[in-house]
Each structure stands twice: as structure tokens, then as C-alpha cells.
Amino acid sequence: MATAAQLVAQRLYEAGCRHAFGIPGGEVLTVMEALKEAGLEFVLVKHENSGGFMAEGTFHVTGAPGVLLATVGPGVANAVNFIVNAEQDRVPLIFLTGCVDPAEAQTYNHQVFDHAALIGSVAKASFTLVDGAVDTIIDKAVSIAMDGRPGPVHIDISTAIAGREQPDEAPTRRVKPAPVAPA
């Protein structure tokens, strides 16, 4: 069985992603390792905002959504400028953020805030990864980022969920949209 982080990484690889940009932090180390195992190269940046623009560059070169990774709190806040830019410039991006476990969020207050409340207001969509729906959430995120008017989609991944093994059943995948020829 694969962990949630491994499933996310595998689905991103299947979507054509080969690079992820960001800054390491305790809450995203499991995700970083899974990205590497799946075949995505992690590129260390000096600021999350610059990582976002690098992710945009990979979209323009490859046609696959860019991938930006940020750790809890300030790491997420540092990326807001780029997320707004990606929404305005129609850049498909998967923005993966690490967070503390929900039970800890009530007592562990160092650099903790509601990522979905901040990013959800400026992105096409924001999801919190939950057990049993990892495949569905990542597939939906990639689809939303690429379909219609492209843009950034946020997925918040707690440390507990990232390392937890997920069921082997493969859910039905969404059919990729096909271009329609004019009549």
C-alpha cells in the first residue's frame, strides 16, 4: 500500500509534472521524499514566491501543471503573491502545503494558521487531504487546474495524512477532457 504522499506524487508524475519547487520544512519532508521517489526533481529555492515563478516556467515549457511546495505558516504566506499572479495569468499550478495534524492545530500555535482560508480566497480551489479520498482529491485538483480557465489549486496535507497508508482500491478516474472539433 502507498502512503497519501506517495499517491499524490504518483498522480502528479502521471499528469506530466517532473519538477517541484519550494523550501523544506518539517511538515513537508514526507511529501518531498515521495515526490523524489515518484520521479519529480525537487528544486530548492530561496523564497516560495520565486519557486512559484519557476513552476510557472515549467508549465510553459512542458504543458503540465507547475508544482509548488510550502511548509506551514510563513512558507504558505510567502507564496500568496504568486498564487494571485497565477490566478490572474491563468497558470495551472498545484500548490502543496504542509500543516500540523488537526488535533495539534488547537494547541500548537507556532506559525499555524488556516491555510485554506487564505489560499482559497485567491486560488481556483483549495482542498484538505483526507484519508480514503487522496486519489480523488489529487485528480480533481489537476483537472480543475487545467480545465476551463487554468489556475492554481491548493492542497493542504497534514503530517499524519502524508505518511499514512491508503487503501489499494483504485477509484474511477475522471475522463480527461478532449478538444471538440468545430462543426
Residue ranges, per PLM feature:
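N-terminal alpha/beta PP-like core and its mobile active-site loop of ThDP/TPP-dependent enzymes
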Residues: 1-183
